[in-house]
Amino acid sequence: HTHIESSLLTPLNYAKLVVPHGTLTVLEDAHEIANVCGEEGLKYMLESNGNIPMRQLLTIPSCVPSVPNLENSGATFDYSLYRTYLEKDYVVGLGEVMDYEGVLCSDERITKILDEAKNKKVYIQGHAPLLQGNRLSAYLCNGIKSDHEARGVQEESKSIDKVLWIDIRDANTNHNMPKIIEALSEIGNL
């Protein structure tokens, strides 16, 4: 999972840098470019696929804007846009469902977007930092399959009980991968 546009590189130049290190496929969530450029940014990322030396699988950003009424964005994606884009080549699912409060409150906009993804039977990626217990269960009941925002050992073990795919990451802002892997291995059945 990556946001190529956050590297400030075009998909081609990004590929030129990562392919020599063995990265041949990335799961691109075009969230940033979609929030700034709207549908044109999304089209750009899709169209770049045939011209780069790696495979770029895309998830269509679920939250444009990230959280309605809380921030301004260059675009607003209506649920009808997903009907078309979730069927495009190289598209494998719906990107980070960040508006977890909207999901939990059955907000009409995010509910319709999730319904489109479920109707298309695509992967739905979660983004639910620190969501636990009944709130996590309610979030997952909407077809969300993973969370790439899990940050702590306690959080990871509680998520496992909910049958949630956990994306463990090591990034410049998050260096706890060894601790999380150790804690998860103690749970067993991994």
Regions found by a protein language model. Name each.
Residues 15-123, 188:
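Divalent-metal coordination cores built from histidine and acidic residues
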Residues 1-15:
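Di-metal (Zn2+ and/or Mg2+/Mn2+) metal-binding site signature of metallo-dependent hydrolases
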Residues 7-9, 34-37, 173-174:
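Acidic-and-aromatic substrate-binding clefts and catalytic sites of carbohydrate-active enzymes
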Residues 1-3, 21, 31, 127, ...:
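Histidine (H) residue identity feature
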Residues 76-96, 102-168, 172-190:
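Histidine/acidic residue-rich metal-binding segments in metalloenzymes
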Residues 1-5, 58-65, 129-130, 137:
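Short N-terminal helix-initiation segments at or just after the protein's N-terminus
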